[in-house]
Amino acid sequence: TAMQKIQFIVSRGATHHAEMQIPPKSIESVVKKLTARYELDLSKDQKYKRKKLGVSVTDLVIFFDITEQVYHLFILVTEGNSLANVTQAGYDKLNPINEPRIVLTDRYELVRTTRKKSAMDNKGRSHNDPETWTWRMTKKYYDVIKAYFDRAVIVYPKDPSQLAKGVYILERVAGLRGIRQQIGFLWAHTVKNWKHTYKSEI
């Protein structure tokens, strides 16, 4: 998915980013321009050699929002000699990763988190970096879902379908690590709210 691709590219060294929204009719011409501007057609070997030489490398991730009928383009650039040239040329406003955060459709944001030592000791891990990147729901989206569940608990005797719809919403939310953790918090909050309201198990 686009979220997984962005997370992978950032975790592998992208330091700057830019985002733009493009209508379907313009996507082909815009991608063509970006490909020429950032040399997006380089092979993996060519990108590797550029990085070894201290030259920045750019990746482009494209996400199509079916609801809004618009393409979200994420330009991800590594640190390097040519980064300054691109920035000075004023092509696109390249921001440092996390300043601001990369946000997808106002619902999800890419954040840096600290891993627990137990997770770092997992032999299945490919690296032991104490910090890692993951996606989570934005505070605004999280609060919207939380408020929905609070109301679903209150109206349950009259309309039990609201709680079922809430569970369906959670099942459709992107299942990446940081988001799964938030879902756990949301459900724990809902269970606690249910017990407080009805004095029984959900």
Residue ranges and their predicted role:
Residues 1-202:
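Non-catalytic terminal/accessory segments
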